[in-house]
Amino acid sequence: VLEPQEDRYEFAWLDCVMDRFAQEGMFVFLATPSGSKPMWLSEKYPEVRRVNKDGRRDASGGRHNHCMSSPVYRAKTAQMNRALAERYKNHPALALWHVGNEFSGECHCDVCRINFQKWLKTKYQTLEALNEAWWSNFWNHTFTDWSQIPTFDQSIDGLTVDWLRFTNDQHISFLRNEMAPLRELTPNVPCTTNFMGTHEGTNYWEWSEHLDIISNDLYPMPDDREETWKQSIASDFIHSLMRGMSGGKPWILLECSPSSVNWGQ
């Protein structure tokens, strides 16, 4: 919608939306579109599409299926964000940047694999230290070269844990890459991204150090799967986490629903 063809932007419709909000005395949390890449981008640069554990590259459609390590996708998202910031940096309705959307998932492409191996080398320095930490000698899984290390092997718990830590770091790196042009051009406009409570494999405490405001999505399910009091306790626990990560300052509930949702059934 914003970039129907490479390097051709269409902001007219968004101009109308932003202007209407300003006329009504309202403010906008403007989101960047990185969570769902356009079809032309996937077709021209197939390397931006994620690769799953068994080596298959994801299809072009859907969302949250881009490679966080892809130099092409990082460059394209930064370019888009720069264009957005240039256009709306002085707009009276712009109050906050909502960067991306619900960062999640992992990619097992060659770029991510090589980056993972570099990440491990930085952490452990030597293969001897890595093998000892992972107890790789068990079942004869000793690594003798960094290039031998895969991104997925459920038989090695240490590898699995480090892969999750690496993926968390890649998401943070991607987030910072997105925020760079926004902070350069609109230094007085805060940046946030929507957390997902206690999302598995994500260290939001580390993420919080890079954000100006903490925000979260919360979808209590009003059905028979769980008693209301249990959902209330779970929601309050997540609210407390957000308050803790924000240092006691206000945080934002970016997404919520008062009723059931189709994807929750």
Protein language model features and the residues they cover:
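A cross-domain feature marking catalytic cores of carbohydrate-active enzymes
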Residues: 1, 30-34, 99-101, 193-195, ...
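Short, solvent-exposed loop/turn segments at secondary-structure junctions
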Residues: 1-3, 199-200, 260-263
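Acidic (Asp/Glu)-rich catalytic clusters
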Residues: 16-25, 85-92, 204-209, 242-248
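Polysaccharide-binding and catalytic clefts of secreted carbohydrate-active enzymes
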Residues: 42-44, 54-224, 228-237
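Carbohydrate-binding surfaces of carbohydrate-active enzymes
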Residues: 219-222, 228-265
